[in-house]
């Protein structure tokens, strides 16, 4: 029987763990462009995009599915020309080669302009399209698929109130704690949580694709080749890193396969999922054991990202890998004490890894984070955990997570500004 609060946890999972095609920052722009074009009611002649600095940072260097190229401008163009606004983060699933070519031509002709929206929330996109003497505008804010306003010729056709979210803050009614997550993951009826196995299916499929072909930096594929050369061990830790990195390789290169995202991020969804899947394979875990571990991982990531904010100066893969470590602990027979140690070990180890945008190099960060996550879980199972005497770690796990969030939201604002300045100042 479901406890009343468990229904809300399930609703959170259905809201935050969803399929996404392509890196979610350029896809958010594609979605906003698709909504603007649909509101215009015809093929646009020009597109003007204004985005927050963090959204720009995460969309500059990553492949856009179906286009063979990168950047916010092509994402906006193909979103407007071939995107389906009703498909959310899979907005580009039906993109045709002809529409992709038209988008590339539009960009080449200088008919797509992208700029930074000064003073905007961390996650913000505004797309204005013109054509046939008419103009339409869409606004997306706070979440990757959260369209809050549509206008045509200056008249509002759709509008919802915009919550004044404090990125990295904590809402009073937030239902999750690590103890509550652990209770739900271990005690909820299996039939109520079995849906999470779809994350394993989708994300394993893109991992297999990443191993089969040469994508991006080939991090996962190179690990696989080195195993075959007997230069690396084929142990469970290496398998976890290999599968996760391979999936990230393919995703960052713009492969047209969906992944199950987490908190608006495909790489974080992959990182929450594939290390747990790897351990389940080697431990010969049942579907129910895998499902419970995935629930532990995905809800932990949702909880930590809620504290930290969707777009941060900190690399989100480290949070997702910490969450995966908690799922791995469950598969190895650990309990809440080991979960606590895993998170403390991660906060004391890899906290501070910067986010310098979505790109093929993310697969290397994913690999590093997963390796640390596995190490943290294994140390935790042996009774080893960093305690409050060291650095930003606290014995109270919720305070430990809050310290990490404070580092990312308050402590690294200047670092985030410098990173973006370096990126946009690069010469072509």
Curated annotation (Swiss-Prot):
GO terms for molecular function: L-cysteine desulfhydrase activity. It holds the Pfam family SDH_alpha. It comes from the Bacteria. InterPro entries: Ser_deHydtase-like_asu (IPR005130), UPF0597 (IPR021144). GO terms for biological process: L-cysteine catabolic process to pyruvate. Belongs to the UPF0597 family. This is UPF0597 protein Dde_0807. It comes from Oleidesulfovibrio alaskensis (strain ATCC BAA-1058 / DSM 17464 / G20).
